[in-house]
Every structure is written in C-alpha cells, then in structure tokens.
Amino acid sequence: MPPVLLTKRIEFAAAHRYGRPEWGDAKNRAVFGRCYNPPAHGHNYLLELTVSGDIDPTTGMVVNLFDLKRVLLDVIEEFDHKNLNLDMPYFKDRIPTSENFAHVLWTKLAAQRDIGALHTLRLC
C-alpha cells in the first residue's frame, strides 16, 4: 500500500512589517508597498501541515491526529498574537515574509517526534 497523506489545519494571528533598515523610506515603499506601513499589519493565518507515512497495522493510523494537533498548537503558541518583527528572534536578521515564516515553522515542526514524515506545509 502506498503511503497515506494526512493534513491538519490550525488558525492563528500575527502581525509583521516588511522593510530593510539599510534602505530609505522611498525604496522600502517601492519594493514592499503597504507591507512597509508602520507600525505593522496583522494577518489571520491558516497553517496546513501534511504528513505522510504507512498505516500502522496495529493502530490503523499513520499518526495520532490528537498528537499532531497538540504539536501544532505547541509550535503556534509561540507566534500567536505576536509581532513577528519585535517579538520573534527568528526575524531579527530577516524579513518576516510568508516564505521566511513558513521556513521557520517547517524547521520547528521537523524537529518534532511522533508526527509522521513532513510532506507539505502551507501557510495561507
């Protein structure tokens, strides 16, 4: 039997602002548009994590979805209702774009145990 994919979704909120400190206001506005507006702007994010694996013949599961949800909640708790620029050390030296944020989340989730093999992370 081929591996099975399971996806869990979770919602959370966070704020951020794009900008490069070495650029002036004009260049930041030209490159980042409204995402440069001070002090920040917020998003209601939807994180979808897809894991893959073989079905365990004893449990009938690839992963216990309660465990997967708990891990997602634990990881997201650090970011929920935070200003990514000001509150998160991950973005001290990089812009908190959706791409960079997804990379940080992937790295944190990849370090978790017992949630199957990470397949896809989607940040909406």
Report residues per predicted region.
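Charge-rich, low-complexity N-terminal segments
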Residues: M1-C124
